[in-house]
C-alpha cells in the first residue's frame, strides 16, 4: 500500500525515490488523495534535497500521464512534430514568427502556451490581442489546424498535465517555485503531453530572465536537456540574452504588430532576428528537416522571403477565428492606446544598462500584464521604440514611447522607464546568443 507520508519521508531523509512510487504520488495529486499539505511537504523536501536525473524523469513522466497525451500518428502528418519553449522575458515575441516559419519548412508545431505572470509577457495574451482568435479551441479544431496549416498556438487545457497545475499552484504559495528539478518537470510534462518528437528550449539570461543568475539559467538548461532526452523526446537548449527587451516593444497588440512586420519583411530588428533564426534553425535540425544550422537558415530565409511564413501565420489566425485580412490591415484590427507619450532621456549618453524586469513591470502597471492569474489585461498598452544597450541618446531624445490608457498611467510609466535606463560615457551591447546545450 502506498503511503504518501513515507514517500515524503524518504525524500526528506535524502533517500532515492523509485518510478512506481513517484507515479503513485502524482496519481494521488490528481485524484485528491494526496493532500495539499503533503504536496507542499514534498516540494520543500525536493527544494532542499533535490531530485536525481532519473527521479526528475520519473516525476515528469508521471505528470505527463496525469491527463491526456496527444498522439499525432493517426493524422499521418508527413513531418516531425516539434516545438520551442521559452522561460519568458520582455518583448519575447519569437513564438509568433517561429511557429509559421518552421511550418513553412515542413514541420508541425502544436504550440501550447501560457499567459503572462509577473514581469514576463505570455504568448497567449499576445494572441488575445487579435480579435476573434480562439486561444482555447476544442481538441478537434486544434488538431485540424495543426494538420492543415502546420502550426496552431493555443492555451493549456485542463486535461493536459492536470497534476502539474495543482503542484504549481501549491509551489507558488509555499516558496518552492525556484526548485530547478520541479521547474523542469513542470515545463517538460506539458510538452510531452503535447506529443512532441523534439523540443528546443530558449533559456533566458539576464536582468529580465526568470532565473536569477546566469549559473541558474545554465543549470536549468542542462536539466531540461537531460530530462527531456531521458523521457524520450529529442531536446536541446540555447541560452539567450534578456538584459533588455528582445523586441523593440513590449505589450500585447504592439508585439503582434511587431511579429506581422517581421513576417512581412517590413522590419526585422537584429537581436529579435538572431534569436528567432537560431531557435528555428535548431528546430529544423532537431526534426531532421535540415542537414545543419546553415542549411536550416537558408530554408528559413527562403520561407520569409517568399512570403510562405507570413501566409502560414495568416492561415493560422483565420483557422482559429481571427480576421482573414490581419496581415494586410493590422491597424484596423489591433487595439491602439488612448495616450502615447515619449520617455525623454534625462541626460546625454550611451545606454549602459537596462533594468529589463522594471520594463516588464511597467507594462504590468499600465494594465498589460497580471499580478494575479485572474486579472484582466488591456492589450493596447505597452512600450515601443525602446533604446538598446550601446545606443547613443541625446538629452531629451526618447528612450522609448509609453502607450497608456490615460495621462496618469503614462506619467507613472515614464518615470519607471527613466529609472530603468542607465546612461554613461560608453556602453557595449551584450551577446544575443550565449551557448547551445545538447
UniProtKB/Swiss-Prot annotation:
Pathway: Pyrimidine metabolism; dTMP biosynthesis via salvage pathway; dTMP from thymine: step 1/2. The keyword Transferase applies. Its EC number is 2.4.2.4. Transmembrane segments: none annotated. GO terms for molecular function: 1,4-alpha-oligoglucan phosphorylase activity; thymidine phosphorylase activity. It catalyses: thymidine + phosphate = 2-deoxy-alpha-D-ribose 1-phosphate + thymine. HAMAP family: Thymid_phosp. Homodimer. The enzymes which catalyze the reversible phosphorolysis of pyrimidine nucleosides are involved in the degradation of these compounds and in their utilization as carbon and energy sources, or in the rescue of pyrimidine bases for nucleotide synthesis. This is Thymidine phosphorylase. It comes from Burkholderia cenocepacia (strain HI2424).
Amino acid at each position: 500500500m502506498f503511503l504518501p507520508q513515507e514517500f515524503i519521508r524518504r525524500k526528506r531523509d535524502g533517500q532515492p525515490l523509485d518510478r512506481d512510487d513517484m507515479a503513485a504520488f502524482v496519481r494521488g495529486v490528481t485524484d485528491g488523495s494526496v493532500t495539499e499539505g503533503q504536496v507542499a511537504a514534498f516540494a520543500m523536501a525536493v527544494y532542499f534535497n533535490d531530485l536525481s536525473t532519473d527521479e526528475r524523469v520519473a516525476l515528469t513522466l508521471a505528470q505527463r500521464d496525469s491527463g491526456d497525451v496527444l498522439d499525432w500518428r493517426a493524422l499521418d502528418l508527413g513531418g516531425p512534430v516539434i516545438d520551442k519553449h521559452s522561460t519568458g522575458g520582455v518583448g519575447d515575441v519569437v513564438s509568433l514568427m517561429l511557429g509559421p516559419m518552421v511550418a513553412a519548412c515542413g514541420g508541425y508545431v502544436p504550440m501550447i502556451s501560457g499567459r503572462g505572470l509577473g514581469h514576463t509577457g505570455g504568448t497567449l495574451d499576445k494572441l488575445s490581442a487579435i480579435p476573434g482568435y480562439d486561444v482555447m479551441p476544442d481538441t478537434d479544431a486544434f488538431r485540424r489546424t495543426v494538420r492543415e496549416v502546420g502550426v496552431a498556438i493555443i492555451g493549456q487545457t485542463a486535461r493536459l498535465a492536470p497534476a502539474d497545475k495543482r503542484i504549481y499552484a501549491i509551489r507558488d504559495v509555499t516558496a518552492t517555485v525556484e526548485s530547478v528539478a520541479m521547474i523542469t518537470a513542470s515545463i517538460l510534462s506539458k510538452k510531452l503531453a503535447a506529443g512532441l518528437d523534439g523540443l528546443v528550449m530558449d533559456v533566458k539570461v539576464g536582468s529580465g530572465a526568470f532565473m536569477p543568475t546566469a549559473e541558474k539559467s545554465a543549470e536549468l538548461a542542462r536539466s531540461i536537456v537531460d530530462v527531456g532526452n531521458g523521457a524520450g523526446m529529442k531536446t536541446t537548449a540555447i541560452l539567450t540574452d534578456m538584459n533588455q527587451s528582445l523586441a523593440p516593444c513590449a505589450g500585447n497588440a504592439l508585439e503582434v504588430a511587431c511579429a506581422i512586420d517581421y513576417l512581412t519583411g517590413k522590419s526585422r530588428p537584429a537581436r529579435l532576428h538572431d534569436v528567432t533564426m537560431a531557435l528555428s534553425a535548431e528546430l529544423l535540425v532537431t526534426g531532421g528537416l535540415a542537414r545543419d544550422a546553415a542549411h536550416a537558415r537558408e530554408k528559413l530565409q527562403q520561407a520569409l522571403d517568399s512570403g510562405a511564413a507570413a501566409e502560414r501565420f495568416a492561415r493560422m489566425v483565420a483557422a482559429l477565428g481571427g480576421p482573414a485580412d490581419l496581415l494586410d490591415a493590422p491597424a484596423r484590427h489591433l487595439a491602439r492606446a488612448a495616450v502615447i507619450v515619449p520617455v525623454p532621456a534625462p541626460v546625454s549618453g550611451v545606454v549602459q544598462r537596462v533594468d529589463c524586469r522594471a520594463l516588464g513591470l511597467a507594462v504590468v502597471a499600465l494594465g498589460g500584464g497580471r499580478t494575479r492569474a485572474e486579472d484582466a489585461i488591456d492589450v493596447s498598452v505597452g512600450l515601443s521604440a525602446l533604446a538598446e544597450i550601446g545606443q547613443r541618446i541625446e538629452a531629451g531624445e526618447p528612450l522609448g514611447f509609453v502607450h497608456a490608457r490615460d495621462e496618469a498611467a503614462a506619467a507613472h510609466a515614464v518615470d519607471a522607464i527613466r529609472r530603468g535606463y542607465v546612461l554613461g560615457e560608453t556602453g557595449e551591447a551584450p551577446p544575443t546568443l550565449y551557448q547551445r546545450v545538447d
